[in-house]
């Protein structure tokens, strides 16, 4: 999935999302990823929270209607922690692309 400058993607169960997931733990519109100031940010918009585990950092961030800057790569848990890597967990990697 590509998110460019001033772009964003919505993640959730609903078909209107750019990234649709099939997990009962995820909300219809669960989270949004967007670019701000050269960083990629994830904003939780769910009922059950979003969890972010960045590779190289043992501490998982729990979001409840909050946002955080994404690290270079890691895991996103939709509605539950990333431990166990079930159908609610997304693996992500950020990379710069030339226009």
Describe each region flagged by the PLM.
Residues 6-37, 83, 89:
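Short, charged beta-strand/loop "edge" motif centered at a coil->beta-strand transition
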Residues 3-5, 35-36, 44, 71:
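Generic beta-strand structural signal
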Residues 38-39, 75:
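Generic structural signal for coil-to-beta-strand starts
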Residues 2, 24-26, 61:
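Short solvent-exposed loop/turn micro-motifs enriched in small/polar/acidic residues
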Residues 30-32, 41, 67:
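Short, surface-exposed charged micro-motifs
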Residues 46, 52-99:
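C-terminal boundary/linker segments immediately following FHA domains
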């Amino acid at each position: 999935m590509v998110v460019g400058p001033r772009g964003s993607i919505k993640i959730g169960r609903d078909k209107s999302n750019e990234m649709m997931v099939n997990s009962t733990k995820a909300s219809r519109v669960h989270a949004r990823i967007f670019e701000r100031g050269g960083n990629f940010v994830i904003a939780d918009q769910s009922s059950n929270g979003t969890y972010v585990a960045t590779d190289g950092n043992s501490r998982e961030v729990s979001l409840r209607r909050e946002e955080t800057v994404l690290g270079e790569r890691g895991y996103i848990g939709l509605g539950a922690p990333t431990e166990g890597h079930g159908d609610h967990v997304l693996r992500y990697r950020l990379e710069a692309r030339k226009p």
